[in-house]
Amino acid sequence: MKPTLAFALLALGVAAPALAQSAGDWTVGVGFGLVSPKDDNGLLAGAATTIDENTRPTLTVEYFPWDNIGVELLAATPFKHTATIAGVGTATTKHLPPTLSLVYHIPTAGKLTPFVGAGINYTAFFSEKSALGVVKMDDSVGLAVKAGVDFALSDKGALRTEVRWMDIDTDVSLGGAAIGTAEIDPIVVGVSYVMKF
């Protein structure tokens, strides 16, 4: 292979799109998240409880104080879930799960940039409804971890896929009386388009 051709191919490889993150950068991601609670959600009113999954639009904003290390805030439109208490009845609730994470984006020379992160989730429950009576679910604070990968479409945009786990437990009352703790602890699968500014 002629040296000039070799250098040309090398230059093309180096110039391949990559979503590199430098100190001072911002990214915004818009997509969808599937919140899938774990299978066993604990006992409410002494009966086994299951909580269904739900998908909603999501938004992430991330600032990079250092190269490849960002502080990310996850937001979403309200998720809605139905809790089924075996032999007793059902209740529905909406929630917002804002999550603040410290994220390390692993630098690579290609289009794929994996990342891992950890932080704190705050889940606010509201609009609880049930034919059984007045239901109240307490807000939750817990650990959140994440991992995923960005596929660069250009030097300013990427397609992101990620998986999160969140520690979400809520004390539940019915008619003012405590009936137990719902252990939600969901896996959250997300797909989004990320833009760098």
Where do the model's predicted regions map?
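Surface-exposed strand-loop-strand hairpins of Gram-negative outer-membrane beta-barrel proteins
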Residues: 36-57, 136-141
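Predominantly the C-terminal beta-signal and adjacent terminal strand-loop region
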Residues: 80-83, 153-197
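A charged, solvent-exposed segment within the mature domains of Sec-exported extracytoplasmic proteins
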Residues: 115, 125-172
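Extracellular loop and loop/strand-boundary signature of outer-membrane beta-barrel proteins
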Residues: 44-48, 84-91, 130-136, 175-181
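Cleavable N-terminal export/targeting peptides
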Residues: 1-24
